[in-house]
Amino acid sequence: MSGHSKFANIKHKKEKNDAAKGKIFTKIGKEIAVAVKEGGSSDPSNNSRLRDVIAKAKSNNMPNDTIERNIKRASGDMSAANYEHITYEGYGPNGTAIIVETLTDNKNRTASNVKNAFTKGSGNVGTPGCVSFMFDKKGQIVIDKEEYEGVADELMMQVLDAGAEDFVEEEDSFEVLTDPDDFSAVRLAMEEAGIPMVSAEVTMIPQTYVELTDPKDIANIQKTLDMLDDDDDVQDVYHNWDE
């Protein structure tokens, strides 16, 4: 199967230099802590949420010893229970839709920072649900196309048999889409089958994309996304800007 899908643009990610990697690892460490607390176990085999966060960590090249250290720390750190999941939705230039997922121990601080990021980019925070209907929540697994040159059909049958909803061929990759509830099982089946994955996580995929042509609009949305990326409380940012 083939189709229009921009997996590289679904989530805004800046170039991963050392400083950016450090910030990403810190945010994932927070997710690991919350997954251990809310999942009730530090054992990934008994905690599907923790398994998913570990997959996300590996997709971001987080070293195994760093992952293990975060899990061990979370097992004896009750402060993670104070973090709250809060999702913000809003609009950027020309009606672009932006979803911001946060983990925070200070709602007022986070709300103020997120609002400021939207305002600085000439956008605004909206009400819950104002843009989320424009996205589909899916498990998304990306495979390097070079690994399966000439055997795409066999790979497609393998992942569909594992429970995937769709198999999309892109220019440089194959993209496997799953129902969020099936993501862990599909990812595990692919892992056990020895299928190498570039990335694997549950994400929000835009149903349509908005193109920006005005340089001012592009600068504004970039400013908003950069400010959100730099906020320690922000875990993930999804948007429908056709970069």
Please state what every model-predicted region is:
Residues 140-243:
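Positively charged, low-complexity, intrinsically disordered RNA-binding extensions
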Residues 1-126, 130-142, 239-242:
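N-terminal cationic and glycine-rich segments that engage phosphates or anionic surfaces
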